[in-house]
Amino acid sequence: MLLDSHRGYDPGALVMARALARAFRAPLVTSTISRLLVDLNRSIGHPQLFSAATRGAPARLRAKMVEQHYRPYRVQVERLVRQSVSRGQRMIHISSHSFTPELDGKLRCADVGLLYHPGRHEEAELCARWKASLAVFAPQLRVRRNYPYAGKGDGLTSHLRRRFPRGAYVGIELEVNQRIVLAAGRRWTALRGALIDALRTAGAAHGDP
């Protein structure tokens, strides 16, 4: 079923996001709206904002989707970042995703991807430390940076980078291989724990609590 496939949603992303929020006592913004309706991680005007299922819908209906589902989510995230920045704090934003192990017949050679903008020193440094910490906590994991996607591509983190100074906003997209998520069990539980422990270590070294 299309809705249950990787084209409909990111399996495990919500579970991972909740685990991170719990561990760091951080605010959590989530949505359970399928990207088959409207993709909350795409900019207005992006050709993939709407899927093939909704792209041909009347303009009035598409506008309603944006107002009911897209804008409230984006506004809430941006408001939290603005509040943090206005207090003189650095906001580290972890956007939780997962990726299909195989796309268009090609295997994705990673268990975890850490996406960031290579021109943002704070993001590159945090991801380097996170990756290094994961090598200690879970050396069996294949961890790659800016894979399977480029961190500077269209997305919510890219939008927020344009809105806030680089020293104040650090936007990272965490990508987890759905092969581990869908296998469930101990490996998926262990992966969540390793990601949290490694991020805590990386954040401390980065000067963040």
Language-model segments: residues:
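N-terminal catalytic or cofactor-binding beta/alpha core of small enzyme domains
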Residues: 1-209
